[in-house]
Amino acid sequence: MEKDWKLFKKKLGGWQEAYMDRLIEEYKDILNSDASSFDKYCTLRKKIYDDYKSPSVLARDVSRSNMFIILLGLLRDEAITMDDLDGFSDELKEDLQQLLK
């Protein structure tokens, strides 16, 4: 489990950055749409508010005990895939897969 924790701490920031890059592209699409300025603003505001609550944007209480929950949130948000968990223990990956079914 210690190996998983060290790998998690090493990768979390990169995963979050990549997810935020994807969100920024989605925000650009909203801003570049043909909608009215008001509709763009409302849509963008709601999306940013919803995205902010995602563990992929802001992982709260990063600790060994919360690592599993954060990984599950990242997978559910499609910020990462099971392939991104290469190097993590088989036990951890199997436990995550069970909950994703």
Descriptions of predicted regions:
Residues 1-101:
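Acidic, Ser/Pro/Thr-rich low-complexity regulatory regions
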